[in-house]
Amino acid sequence: MGIYEELKARGLIAQVTDEEQIRELVNNGKATFYIGFDCTADSLHVGHFMALCLMKRLQMAGNKPIALIGGGTTMIGDPSGRNDMRKMLTKEDIDHNAECFKRQMERFIEFGEGKAMMLNNADWLMNLNYIELLREVGACFSVNNMLRAKCYEQRMEKGLSFLEFNYMIMQSYDFYHMFQTVGCNMQFGGDDQWSNMLGGTELIRRKLGKDAHAMTITLLLNSEGKKMGKTASGAVWLDPNKTTPFDFYQYWRNVGDADVLKCIRMLTFLPLEQIDAMDAWEGSQLNKAKEILAYELTKLVHGEEEANKAQEAARALFGGSGSSENMPATQLPEARFTDGKIGAIELLVACGLCASNGEARRLIQQGGVAVNDQKVASIDVTFDQAQFAGDGVVIKKGKKVFHRAYTA
């Protein structure tokens, strides 16, 4: 089975410009392809994870990846799928975020001479002359076609700024530039990027008379059609300081029964034969599948040691074995206690489990908090400082969030 057939079997391919030519290129290690990453935060998240895995798979098959850091396009902001304009970031913020991205990408992709490349589109976009750009590529874009593009669809009623309207042209120019300078012949991206990607292939065809190709990756959606990779508290990050390895593990351990095998197939590197054998699993076997998914993805992102710790901590909570010391924890300072006690509301806020006293109050009143398996029945409950000595206490928020609180 070639790599193209494997990607298809894993459900990763959404749309392609020319299936036969793309199959020929990737199966024979002839694709020099890029995926763009705009630097809108200081960490990659689960939405980027699928793209990184795709790059790794294709590199293992002999193809050459280009990780394009969007130092220039981030200055504009991608309107795809947005209801409002993205927050404008400073150049310093973007440069910092780009450095964070580089460090995380190096855990997945092998960079170096003859291997993967990492480029930053700020190196060419920031120096463009506007008049020259209009003359060089402006005539290749139809405003009528651009206005019909799906990437602008959600913004047309609420207002699309001219700044954002230029995003497609900038992304297309990236492909055009790299096609000429580093032989990049293919672009991959999320299915919501299809219009922007076609802009690039068309620009290359019209300006250079040559073929370039595009393929979109299936969006990671749950059985309800919602994007995966987000929790009630926000995105699931790849940075362990933003989403702990335990919380990352728990996110995947708690996916729905209808989604677990799809996630294993799309995101892990387990052999397809092994995954196909799981298709008949049901009931308690699906819990085993969720453990496999959580462990494999945590190992990919955070390493085997952290995956083992997260799995042990989860089993301690749900199976009555192992140690709880590896779950997320907060050391409470002396100042948090008044007369040797701390209230339930303050405890939740101090541990970052609630953003405010009001949120903590509502959570307790709804019966959503337990400490050491004892439900917190009232907002007036207090805890003695002595209870937090040693391993401390385990706080349970809802059904799936656990946190350890202790004192020095």
Region spans (language model):
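Short, hydrophobic/aliphatic alpha-helical segments
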Residues: 28-36, 58, 65, 172-181, ...
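A charged helix-plus-loop insertion that forms the helical arch/lid used to bind
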Residues: 79-95
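Short acidic, glycine/serine/threonine-rich loops at helix termini
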Residues: 77-81, 128-134, 226-232
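Divalent-metal (Mg2+/Mn2+/Ca2+)-assisted nucleotide/phosphate chemistry catalytic cores
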Residues: 10, 90-91, 97-216, 222
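N-terminal catalytic cores of NTP/NDP-binding nucleotidyl/phosphoryl-transfer enzymes
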Residues: 21-79, 188-194
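Conserved nucleotide- and phosphate/pyrophosphate-binding catalytic cores
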Residues: 204-408
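Buried hydrophobic packing segments
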Residues: 51-58, 178, 196-204, 297, ...
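Positively charged, low-complexity intrinsically disordered leader regions
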Residues: 1-33
